[in-house]
Amino acid sequence: MRSFFVTGTDTGVGKTIVSCGLAAAFRQKQADIGVFKPFLSGVPRTHPESDTSLLKDMSQTALSHEEITPFEWKEPLAPYTAAMLEGKSVSMADVMAHWSKIKNRHECFIVEGAGGISVPLGENYLVSDLIKAMELPAVIVTRPDLGTINHTYLTVEYAKNMGIEVLGIIINGVRSRPGLDEKTNPSMIETLCKVPILGITPKLDHVSSENIQHMIEKHIDVSSFMNLTQMGR
């Protein structure tokens, strides 16, 4: 299996839920899976409800919180902005150095970005630049409702123009009683973007490890997804 990068059309679209669910589902199928979320803003990485803690718990990796998330910032802002407020900076070389230390600890890694694909992570580099530097294909998480066609298309086209391989799209957060927009958007997104919809996942009323894993296993063909990660360009 190849490692891959989970990015999104925006913040709050469900990248962590999707990443955690995939990690648990892959592990259930005996995959040797690791997780890497290099940046975290607004909450300590060791907090039991942090994205880092959830990723660690659901992947069951032996990597420490510090290895999973080497850079954390106090303010819930874009990493570059949050770092500047603390008088700090993280270079692309810093991130890649941490990645080099852990990338051979597991057969496959799910790497999660921060916010959308164009969020600034440091001076002169964005999430997209990190994806390129890591030489990973991307999975794009998007929301299901009105406006998502535009945001998703722009994200996919931008990724393609950057030379990033897009494995597919996961539409996350569909309501229990979906509106007409949520019913019609997936087919339009797939037609316009010309990349596969890997899954359409519902909005969780209660977020727990069990619910996340069950949701992913129910709404995404995990075996096909794993096969997709084994295919090169």
Swiss-Prot record:
Annotated compartments: Cytoplasm
Ligase as UniProt keyword: yes
Binding site residues for Mg(2+): T16, D51, E112
Names of required cofactors: Mg(2+)
Pathway the protein contributes to: Cofactor biosynthesis; biotin biosynthesis; biotin from 7,8-diaminononanoate: step 1/2
Keywords: ATP-binding, Biotin biosynthesis, Cytoplasm, Ligase, Magnesium, Metal-binding, Nucleotide-binding
Recorded catalytic activity of this chain's protein: (7R,8S)-7,8-diammoniononanoate + CO2 + ATP = (4R,5S)-dethiobiotin + ADP + phosphate + 3 H(+)
Positions with a binding annotation for ATP: G12, V13, G14, K15, T16, I17, D51, E112, G113, A114, G115, P202, K203, L204
The keyword Translocase belongs to this UniProt entry's keyword annotation: no
Enzyme Commission number(s) from the entry: 6.3.3.3
Active-site residues annotated for this sequence: K37
Gene Ontology molecular function terms on file: ATP binding; dethiobiotin synthase activity; magnesium ion binding
Quaternary data: Homodimer.
PANTHER family per the UniProt record, alphabetical: ATP-DEPENDENT DETHIOBIOTIN SYNTHETASE BIOD 2, DETHIOBIOTIN SYNTHETASE
Main function: Catalyzes a mechanistically unusual reaction, the ATP-dependent insertion of CO2 between the N7 and N8 nitrogen atoms of 7,8-diaminopelargonic acid (DAPA, also called 7,8-diammoniononanoate) to form a ureido ring.
Annotated HAMAP family: BioD (MF_00336)
Protein name per UniProt: ATP-dependent dethiobiotin synthetase BioD
Organism: Bacillus velezensis (strain DSM 23117 / BGSC 10A6 / LMG 26770 / FZB42)
